[in-house]
Amino acid sequence: MTKEYATLAGGCFWCMVKPFTSYPGIKSVVSGYSGGHVDNPTYEQVCTNQTGHVEAVQITFDPEVTSFENILDIYFKTFDPTDDQGQFFDRGESYQPVIFYHDEHQKKAAEFKKQQLNEQGIFKKPVITPIKPYKNFYPAEDYHQDYYKKNPVHYYQYQRGSGRKAFIESHWGNQNA
């Protein structure tokens, strides 16, 4: 199997895993921390907004089965790309959305998708999700991995109570909500 990586942030990483898991070609989705200056950060450190890291997921995928463009299509249906101050009721640096590109193809695909969404006018405000070069990724603690499976009731309450589910449904219907 050929494999590539997509590293994406869209607020709380608990809500960024499940939407990707049912698509062919996606081999794994790992919750973690990306983009900062502290090696091997802990959740507690990242939450202080002093590490430079954001909560992110790293997706391992087979490019012969699915494309980075398909992953971006899923990604933009999981969060509010018009808010760069955090996501829903999670505010601050560690919850900012970011696309971390691994190569020039990913950078161009992300720029194109962002432009396309702005031209389509799906959102009332412009899509402003930053596109940055990939620097690092550190897996989060085990209790954060596959949170939606380990804690389904809390996951559902969190997704609903934060406003994420309602936002996604209002823009995309029940896809990924």
Curated annotation (Swiss-Prot):
Keyword field contains Ligase: no
EC assignment: 1.8.4.11
Presence of keyword Oxidoreductase: yes
Keyword vocabulary terms for this entry: Oxidoreductase
SUPFAM superfamilies assigned: Peptide methionine sulfoxide reductase (SSF55068)
Annotated active site: 12
Induction details: Induced by oxacillin but not by hydrogen peroxide.
Similarity comment: Belongs to the MsrA Met sulfoxide reductase family.
PANTHER family given in the database record: PEPTIDE METHIONINE SULFOXIDE REDUCTASE, PEPTIDE METHIONINE SULFOXIDE REDUCTASE MSRA 2
Note: Stereospecific for the S isomer of MetO.
Function (record text): Has an important function as a repair enzyme for proteins that have been inactivated by oxidation. Catalyzes the reversible oxidation-reduction of methionine sulfoxide in proteins to methionine.
Name under which the protein is recorded: Peptide methionine sulfoxide reductase MsrA 2
Originating species: Staphylococcus aureus (strain NCTC 8325 / PS 47)
